[in-house]
Amino acid sequence: MVRTKQALIYTCAALFCCLSSFAQHATRSGYRSPLDIPLNLSGNFGEFRNNHFHSGLDIKTQGREGLDVHAIAAGKVSRINVSAYGYGNAVYIDHPDGHTSVYAHLSKFSPEIEAFVKDAQYELESWEVELYPGPGALLVDSSDVIAWSGNSGSSGGPHLHFEIRQTDTEFPMNPLLWGFE
């Protein structure tokens, strides 16, 4: 009986060690919070939705739109979406460390991004656009206000949808592993 318990304990310990090697490990990368308010969540990473797993965090904005949304680190704006569905108004920023931060359901963009979007909308004669600015077209520094929180796209109320992805694969990473509180 004692040997069975010992074998079970060793087996569980070995299993735990093996499985934990597949986990996403926490890192402190120096990223700042995308909002200047406490990060209270209405949706968490990996939650099962009606037809997919949630790939980011839904951060409550205290029932308000128009809160400053900051770049979490320096980088280049690599993609901008304007749509009545999905992420609505969204900004993607590629960072030098190989990660991309995504900010969605925004009410409006910073003046520089807004001017870029408006020019493209007129040129394409379309309100809905998916834009990929060239390298160096839209650079941001850590803490720059890139947009304001909102309720655009397929959103059930004012909040910020925030993601961190691997840039080369677009594989979603759990933002909580970067120490956001």
Write out the residue ranges for each language-model feature:
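A solvent-exposed, charged loop/short amphipathic helix patch at secondary-structure junctions
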Residues: 117-128
